[in-house]
A protein has these predicted regions:
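Divalent metal-dependent catalytic cores for phosphoryl transfer on phosphate-bearing substrates
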Residues: 161-357
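Short, well-ordered alpha-helical segments
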Residues: 133, 261, 265, 269, ...
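Acidic/polar, low-complexity linker and loop regions
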Residues: 95-108, 138-141, 148, 302-307
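Active-site-adjacent bridging/hinge elements
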Residues: 101-116, 234-247
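C-terminal effector/catalytic modules and regulatory tails appended to multi-domain proteins
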Residues: 2-110, 332-335, 339, 343-488
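Alpha-helical phosphate/pyrophosphate-handling elements in metalloenzyme active cores
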Residues: 35-38, 42-59, 63-86, 114, ...
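Broad hydrophobic/π-residue packing in well-ordered secondary structure
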Residues: 121, 126-129, 183-185, 270, ...
Length: 488
């Protein structure tokens, strides 16, 4: 059974609990007809994930596109429905529409067509069309597990109380839109490689495909960056009125991200400019521009979507809380690795079987504990080189997590411990577990445990391990090896 089918079956098993949870939170008169888990979406999912074949989604790419835009539309419709400034809650004869989604779908189709070029343009480029759907699927499963425990606890801001369907809609827009800017970012790298190649026969080749903005475009981008980088404060002397204040750290970090053309910030700009839902946002930093409670709530909903998307490629923004959308996107985006092949993988005999095990979240402990687990089974071939590739990739991921979950101002308040666990089985007689531990009360470290067999001086694992961690010796008598690493 494919990983996609496993997660779909898990979601299916939890839908009844979700329905009960949702019904307990929202009265019958206020239940939206359209949302990301309505009957129409449930039927589309049932038609999409049927056989359990590993490549089923790639064989049904047109259906993936169809459900992608349906989910986007239903999410916007749901969010508009619960906006009390609009007429839909009071007048059920009126139905909200998702304006701008035709333009977004047109962009997404071009994105899909263009992706085939990117496979040949970068050795390590991997699918991002099916990927975003899988990220959504994994996130939905996490939100619905254990009687919707994570869905219940996830929040946006103290001034932004949202119901379960609004939370699902926010997650849907974040997960399905977070990589829209990827082709633009990658195209620049392809141009750089072409320019470098041309230097062999052309002196100072002139090729320019920088994403330059000028005039009004710069002003528009700056407005969106300020929108993402602000928060609301109660106006002095006014009980129910608020004013917006810029958060300079966020603003500078997102400016830096845009300067480097990272696809997260570009994706945020794309959806803000294409979807009327965002263009209708109320926002100003002027002191005399005030917001009431619903204005504030709607501002935070939109800011959460844009900020989460921008933050997932902005390592300068570190994470303090597990129960927010930004954390969930990073978790699901980094974890979704099943079924993704790069150009390099397609032309190399693969003696390594990869299995994604799960994302396990324990919300019953203090602090919360999050574990991302997968495994590699190596059969034949150059075992040492296979282990070396796995460990190098693990080290790269570890660096990403250590930066995102690094210590900084207010990190004493961090409410979670994080584990990234990889199980490596090079032969039938040996098995090793490599665990990146980032905890609230200790320095980050990597712990290697032999779960079957013994360490030995000349085996493939020891050689690969010493190549990745120079100076670290494996003690054959030990069952566990700890490697201290500095948070970056």
């Amino acid at each position: 059974m494919s990983t996609d089918k496993q997660y779909y079956d898990s979601i299916l098993a939890n839908l009844a609990n979700f329905d009960s949870y949702y019904n307990s939170k929202v009265t019958r008169k206020k239940r939206a007809n359209e949302h990301p888990l309505d009957d129409g979406i449930r039927q589309k999912l049932a038609d999409l994930i049927v056989t359990g074949k590993e490549n089923e989604l790639f064989e049904k790419l047109s259906m993936v596109q169809e459900i992608w835009i349906s989910l986007i539309k239903k999410s916007i419709i749901c969010l508009r429905y619960y906006d009390t400034r609009e007429p839909f809650l009071q007048n059920r004869s009126k139905t909200p529409l998702a304006y701008g989604t035709d333009s977004l779908l047109d962009y997404f189709k071009k994105y899909t067509d263009f992706e085939s070029l990117l496979y040949g343009g970068a050795n390590h480029y991997r699918d991002h069309v099916v990927h975003v759907f899988r990220v959504w699927l994994l996130g939905i499963d996490i939100l619905l597990r254990n009687n919707c425990q994570y869905l219940d606890k996830i929040k946006i801001d103290q001034y932004c109380l949202i119901n379960p369907l609004e939370k699902l809609s926010v997650w849907t827009l974040i997960s399905l839109s977070h990589d829209l800017g990827y082709p633009l970012e990658k195209s620049l790298q392809i141009v750089e490689k072409t320019r470098d190649m041309m230097k062999n026969f052309v002196t100072n080749p002139i090729m320019n495909m920088d994403i330059d903005f000028s005039g009004v475009q710069n002003n528009m981008n700056d407005f969106v960056l300020r929108f993402m980088s602000s928060k609301m404060h109660k106006k002095d002397g006014e009980h129910d009125l608020y004013v917006a204040r810029l958060q300079p750290k966020y603003y500078f970090k997102f400016q830096k991200s845009l300067e480097h053309n990272t696809h997260g910030i570009i994706s945020s700009l794309i959806i803000y400019k294409l979807l009327i839902f965002f263009m209708e946002s109320d926002y100003s930093l002027h002191e005399d521009y005030t917001f009431d409670k619903e204005d504030v709530r709607q501002y935070y909903i939109r800011r959460e979507i844009l900020r989460a998307i921008a933050s997932h490629t902005c390592p300068d923004v570190y994470q303090l809380n597990m129960c927010n959308m930004s954390y969930l996107l990073i978790l699901c985006d980094e974890s979704q690795d099943w079924g993704r092949k790069s150009l390099t993988n397609l032309y190399v005999d693969d003696n390594v079987k990869y299995t994604f095990k799960d994302v396990d979240i324990d919300m019953g402990s203090t602090p919360f504990v999050c574990k991302v687990q997968d495994s590699y089974n190596i059969s034949g071939g150059d075992v040492e080189q296979s282990i070396l590739r796995i460990l190098k990739r693990f080290l790269g991921q570890s660096k990403t997590y250590r930066i995102l979950f690094r210590d900084g101002q207010d990190t004493a308040k961090r409410d979670f411990d994080f584990h990234r666990i990889v199980e490596i089985e090079p032969t039938n007689s040996k098995r090793f577990e490599v665990d990146l531990k980032i905890t609230t009360n200790a320095q980050a470290q990597i712990v290697v445990t032999q779960t079957r067999g013994r360490f030995s001086e000349n085996d493939a694992f020891n050689k690969a391990f010493k190549a990745v961690f120079p100076g670290c010796e494996v003690d054959p008598a030990a069952k566990t090896l700890k490697v201290s690493i500095e948070s970056e």
